[in-house]
């Protein structure tokens, strides 16, 4: 049987990948989670029908997300990652011995367990002794932070559903308060290449 997975971008555009088999399918309190094995990219993680990353290309996102703020900040010691349950960002952060504390705030515990099982090379970062995982909402977590972090990385998915709160005025205000005076915040931003994505990108600002 010829199996294909398709991620629909617009009524006229979709990304399709030949799929060898489905390794996992589940539904957490927050989202649908699928792991597929593909000949071209290896295993891919799919959340709510959208590809999050693959074995072949995770470094593109994770390394750019981490290395830029780490190169710019003069003396980073404490980092907060909002989202990041797959462990990819944490894995790159743990390459820096100068970091003393890495806090991961991820509401979806099922996502973390799935990634530990199917993407162990990425999830190894979650086992570093400097890493603390908090299973809670990122916006609520930030409300109790003040002058705590050198770097905040918003590694949440696009601003829909349970992540909407991480792209609001309250979130940015709380992030500013949680950062130290020379702190840096970085967050992922989808591409508005298609007209259908424009409203989502605008909502992040």
PLM region spans:
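The AdoMet/dcAdoMet-binding core of the Class I SAM-like
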Residues: 2, 53-187, 194-201, 205
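N-terminal auxiliary segments of SAM/dcSAM-dependent transferases
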Residues: 1-44
């Amino acid at each position: 049987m010829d199996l294909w997975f398709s991620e629909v971008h617009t009524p006229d555009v979709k990304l399709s990948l030949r799929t060898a088999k489905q390794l996992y399918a589940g539904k957490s309190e927050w989202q649908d989670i699928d792991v597929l094995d593909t000949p071209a990219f290896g295993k891919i993680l799919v959340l709510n029908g959208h590809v999050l990353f693959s074995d072949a290309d995770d470094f593109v996102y994770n390394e750019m997300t981490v290395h830029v703020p780490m190169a710019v900040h003069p003396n980073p010691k404490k980092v907060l990652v909002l989202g990041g349950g797959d462990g990819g960002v944490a894995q790159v952060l743990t390459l820096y011995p100068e970091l003393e504390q890495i806090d991961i705030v991820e509401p979806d515990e099922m996502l973390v367990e799935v990634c530990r099982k199917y993407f162990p090379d990425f999830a190894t970062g979650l086992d570093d002794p400097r890493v603390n995982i908090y299973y809670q909402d990122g916006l609520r977590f930030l409300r109790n932070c003040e002058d705590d972090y050198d770097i905040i990385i918003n590694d949440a998915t696009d601003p829909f559903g349970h992540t909407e709160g991480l792209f609001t005025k309250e979130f940015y205000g709380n992030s500013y308060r949680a950062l130290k005076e020379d702190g840096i915040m970085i967050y992922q931003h989808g591409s508005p290449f298609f007209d259908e994505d424009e409203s989502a990108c605008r909502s992040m600002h």
